[in-house]
Each structure stands twice: as structure tokens, then as C-alpha cells.
Amino acid sequence: MSIGKMLSPAAIGVAVAGLLAITPVRAQESIKIGLILPMTGGQASTGKQIDNAIKLYMQQNGDTVAGKKIEVILKDDGALPDNTKRLAQELIVNDKVSFIAGFGVTPAALAAAPLATQGKIPEIVMAAGTSIITERSPYIVRTSFTLAQSSTIIGEWAVKNGIKKVATLTSDYAPGNDALASFKEHFTAGGGEIVEEVKVPLANPDFAPFLQRMKDAKPDAMFVFVPAGQGGNFMKQYAERGLDKSGIKVIGPGDVMDDDLLNGMGDAALGAVTAHIYSAAHPSQINKDFVAAYKKAYGSRPGFMAVSGYDGIHLIYEALKKTGGKTDGDALIEAMKGMKWESPRGPISIDPETRDIVQNVYIRKVEKVDGELYNVEFQTFEAVKDSGKTKK
């Protein structure tokens, strides 16, 4: 029996109207974001912070942009670049994502870069901090930081503030090399001396034997870079070796004093001076609101990885608004270039030439505030670009 014989004209009219009402919803496809993060392993705190911040942003701002629903597909790469590449390919080919984002470590971001280029898919780097990353694909935009930004600043600050002899301890991979090179250049240019230089393995490092070498060198301070998540272990062994009682100060980029882990480090962290892009103690109202909302949602304070994820999803939302919800990769990248906004960390922008972030870098000192440890900012360097690129 045909449909016409089964239904009355009135019923057919209702059915057609129903189909017309449904059609626009079907045509309004969701925009998918492939979020690749280390949710397990030694970098898991990075993944957790970024994932939390993205969820918070979407709770606050909704899950619809330019009339299209935003769908985030989270994948755990364990900070292993082979996993990253496989997951990125699956997300692009099978899930048809319009963005890939996250990337807890530099090797992960680099592993995905050729796929971003081939697919013309924007790759939003929310964590990895090596300068070269944005040069590996015209489709990469970064909302985190570079190690050169903060390490350059702390090198200049140290030599101007009575620190003459420094021993360095850095993780032996690309960001650690960037941090070391930037610090050394600016510290020694001001007359400072490097009295000991140690590189430690990235995976599961035992800092104890290296810390003894630091202690024996008797520097004024130790310049330390270890990735987010390892700072707590480093400070534990620093205290066990008695370096906190020996007068050897800890200085460095802020990764070692991540707000997410700071309270667990104990009083050994007091007095550490670092240069970084964000502190949970940043005094702006927008940051106070961000910290309060994050604490309410997750029971802990946000760190610099959280704010980088928060700004990363904001960048995606704003780019989609500019394109009217269109997901052409070239149009999205053009929309992101030069974008400026007020972040919980302070004013930030995307350099239209390099697609890297331009932001304030703050000198902070670990102090106890209301019984908790915080990175308290006391000096600001405004609108800092990546020095690794400004030389070119």
C-alpha cells in the first residue's frame, strides 16, 4: 500500500511540515574538536588541567557557536608521539574533526604537524613550549607559551639582582634545551657565570645524584627546568638533599612551581623565584573569577596549563564566530592571526606573523598567603614575544 493511500491529506501535510522542521537540524552539523592530551603517565596533570579548563569554558559559554554545536573528542596519547600521530590521523580521517588541539609535550605537537598541513586542519597547541613548533606547519597556532619567553626574562632578572653564579638542571629534551640556551645567553651576557650544567632524563628522573652535584658546586642559585608535573618530585628531593637549607635558591621558568602542585611541595619551595605567564594569585578580577569557578568545579586551583587550555578553546570559539561557523582551515587560521583578548593571565594576542602567543611574563616569588603557597607576582614584562623568533 502506498503512503498516499495510508494517510489523509491533512496527515500528509503534518508529516511534510515535520520533515521540513527536522531538515535544518540535520543540516546543522556539529563542529568536532579532537583534543589530544596526556591523561595518564608522568604528564597527566597537564592533560587534566587543560581538559578541566575546556569543560569549564564550555559550561560558562555554551556548546554552540555560530549556530553549530561544538563536540570535543578527548584522546589520551600518554605524551608518546607515536600515539599522538596515530590518534590525530584517526580523528582527522574517521571522526572528521575541524581542529586538533592540546599536545602536552613538544614531540607530540611535532608529530601531528604534518597531518595538520596535509589536512589543512588548525592545530591549537595548548601546552608544548619549544619555539620551533609553530614553524613546522602554517596551520599551527599556540596559546601556551615558549620556554624562551620566560627563560630569557629570568636570566636578565637574576644577573641584575645579585645572582652571579648559577648551576643549571634541565630536562634533556627540546624544551629543556630551549630554556637552557635562552637563560645562558642572557645571564652570561650580563656577567653571570654557569658553574655546573646538568641534564636529566625526561622519563621518570631520579634527581638525587644530580642534586648532589649542584650542592657541591656551591652556586648562588640553581636554574631549574622540568616539565609540568615533575616539579613536586624535584622539590621533594631538593629538600631531602638539604639544598633548601644550604642557601642555594631555586630560579627558573615557572613550570617547576606549577600552581597545580605547589601546595604539596611544602616550605622548601618558599622563596623560589620564577618567571612565567600565569599565577593563580594574579590580581585581576577576571582571574579571581576564573580561579573561583575552577576551584568550585574541581576542588583545586588552576595552573598555567589550565589557563592555556581555557584560552585555547576561547580562540577556537572566536575564530568560528569570525568565519560564521565555516570550518575552512585557511579561513580559520586567518581569523586567529592578530586576535587579542583579556585572559585570566593578562592581555594576550596571536602574533600574525608567527602564529605564536604574545603575553606578559611575570617575575614571581613563592610566598605563604592565608596558609597556602602561591607564586606572588612582583614584576611584569609586558607583551613578550618569543625571543627564539624575534632574532630571525
Give residue spans per PLM region.
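Bacterial N-terminal signal peptides
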Residues: 9-21
